[in-house]
Amino acid sequence: MTIKITRSDPRYAMLQRSRNLRWDGNPAEAAAEIELCETAEQAAEALQRAVNAGVRPTVRSGGHCYEDFVVNNPGGTILDLSLLKSDALPGDGKRYRISAGHELGEAYISLYKRYGVTIPGGSCFEVGAGGHITGGGFGVLSRLHGLTIDWLSAAEILTVDNKGHVALRIVDEKHEPDLFRACRGGGGGNFGIVTGFLFDRLPAAPYEVANA
C-alpha cells in the first residue's frame, strides 16, 4: 500500500515542493495528492488508480526536474518514487540494479562497496536515478565511458495500454526493443514509468578522484 499524502496532511506542503525553487508550486495549480511508492507494484497500483480516476499522473524520483513537468499538476497525482530503492537482483543475480528512487550518491556508494564498479553519471549526489538515467545520464566520466544509458541492458517499466490497463514489464534489446530504445534517453522518460535499471556490466570505479 502506498503512502498517500493529501492537501490536508501537514507533510503535503514540503513533499509537494520541487528541489528547483523556480517551480515552487502554485497552490491554485497544485496536485490533489501525492502517492509515495516503495515498490514497483505499488507504483503500478497508484498509476492504475490515476488512470481509472481520469487524472493526470506526474512522476518524481529526486525532484530535480529543470522544467515544470511535475509539481504544478491541477487536480492530479504526483507519483513519488523517492522511497523505491530495492537492490534486489533478478534471475541469476548477475545483473546490477539501480532503482528509480536511488539518489546518484547512494547508487555510487552501493556499487563501489559491493562490486567496485560505477556508472558514468552526474556529480550531484542528490539527483534521482529515475530522471537522470532516462535523460541519458551524463557525468564527469562520460568522456571516458560514455553515457549511463550506453551501459543499460534492460529497464523495468510501467506502461498503460489503449484500454487503460497498467502493466509492469522488463524490456531489453530482444524484448520490445523499440520501447527499450525509447527508455535510453529518448523523450525524457515519457513512454512509461521506469522503476528499475538493469546493467549486465559496468565500468570499474576510478582508482582515485580529485576535487577542485
Per-region residue spans from a language model:
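Long, contiguous hydrophobic alpha-helical segments, chiefly transmembrane helices and signal peptides
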Residues: 66, 129-134, 138-140, 155, ...
